[in-house]
């Protein structure tokens, strides 16, 4: 198999895992693009991205332009004379002149089965919608948002136990394997691109903290999907006793209830059962303000009086 001279562009840990796979391969990473250092932590100290840290540790030249729209940045990239540019969660828009610069163009690893869940939060939205499977798509980039021709797809079933955290880990393992497979096909000229079906496309909007508020007027199944989608961020929550209480883990109960949505039906070490518009949601792990996440048995030991049966939890509209 031919080795390729690669520019890698990415920023978070998810991207760094793909860079590590390239460094372990026969390909040559000749330059790394990543976001400028950002203030982080309580001291707001300028902090390098995980991708930059990995590149520096491996003595690879690092480029951190604030934009790739200006000619000097574009000329610097062209001077690297790369065969291909691999983009994984980079965070900057690539103008057409950049997309056309490498001999084989630019490819992207995206955490969904395109054209479903284009955009910023594909892992979370797949859980939020109750999808049964997700996966990774390697695509040839164009000027649209995740609209390029698909080069390779790998599939992953979504388990009932999955959260965004666990799916992230699974896709962070699957993505690098798919990337190396796609690069092999591109280097050998054996990979056929497939157009995306626009009729099947939808958009994975970024999550917001406001969206994580549990609305008991939804079904138990939808709320269960949201709890999993919003773990580990921003974490589903409800307001009660003047406090914001986060819900880290829940499941749909087999209990049947005609109580008003938001009514606590039972509270035991097995969970706190809450009536919804359709079905009952059992809360299993929660977090009180200023505390770490705890299982419900420990929560009830500390604040059992808050969760007495027939207590009504406030709804979003109330």
Swiss-Prot record:
Key words of the record: Protein biosynthesis, Transferase
Catalytic activity annotation: L-methionyl-tRNA(fMet) + (6R)-10-formyltetrahydrofolate = N-formyl-L-methionyl-tRNA(fMet) + (6S)-5,6,7,8-tetrahydrofolate + H(+)
EC number: 2.1.2.9
A Pfam family matched in the record: Formyl_trans_C
GO MF assignments: methionyl-tRNA formyltransferase activity
Top-rank taxon: Bacteria
Protein role: Attaches a formyl group to the free amino group of methionyl-tRNA(fMet). The formyl group appears to play a dual role in the initiator identity of N-formylmethionyl-tRNA by promoting its recognition by IF2 and preventing the misappropriation of this tRNA by the elongation apparatus.
Official protein name in the record: Methionyl-tRNA formyltransferase
Organism: Shewanella sp. (strain W3-18-1)
Gene: fmt
């Amino acid at each position: 198999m031919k080795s390729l001279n690669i520019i890698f562009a990415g920023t978070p840990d998810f991207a760094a895992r793909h860079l590590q796979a390239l460094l372990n391969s026969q390909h040559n990473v000749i330059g790394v693009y990543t976001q400028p250092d950002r203030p982080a932590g309580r001291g707001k100290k300028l902090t390098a991205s995980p991708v930059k840290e990995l590149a520096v540790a491996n003595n690879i030249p690092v480029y951190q332009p604030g934009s790739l729209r200006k000619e000097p940045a574009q000329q610097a990239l062209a001077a690297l004379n790369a065969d291909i540019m691999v983009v994984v969660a980079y965070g900057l828009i690539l103008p057409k002149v950049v997309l056309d610069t490498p001999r084989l163009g630019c490819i992207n690893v995206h955490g969904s089965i395109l054209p479903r869940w284009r955009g910023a939060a594909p892992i979370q939205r797949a859980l939020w919608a109750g999808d049964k499977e997700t996966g990774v798509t390697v695509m040839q980039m164009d000027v649209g948002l995740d609209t390029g021709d698909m080069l390779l797809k790998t599939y992953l079933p979504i388990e009932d136990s999955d959260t965004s955290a666990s799916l992230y880990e699974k896709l962070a393992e699957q993505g690098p394997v798919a990337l190396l497979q796609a690069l092999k096909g591109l280097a050998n000229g054996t990979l056929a691109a497939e157009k995306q079906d626009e009729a099947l496309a939808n958009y994975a909007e970024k999550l917001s903290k406001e969206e994580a508020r549990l609305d008991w007027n939804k079904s138990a199944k939808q709320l269960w999907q949201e709890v999993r989608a919003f773990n580990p961020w921003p974490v589903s929550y409800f307001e009660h006793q003047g406090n914001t209480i986060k819900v880290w883990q829940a499941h749909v109960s087999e209990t049947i209830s005609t109580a008003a949505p938001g009514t606590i039906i039972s509270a035991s070490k097995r969970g706190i059962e809450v009536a919804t518009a359709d079905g009952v949601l059992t809360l299993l792990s929660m977090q009180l303000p200023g505390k770490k996440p705890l299982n419900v048995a420990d929560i009830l030991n500390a604040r059992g009086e808050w969760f007495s049966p027939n207590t009504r939890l406030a709804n979003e509209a109330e």
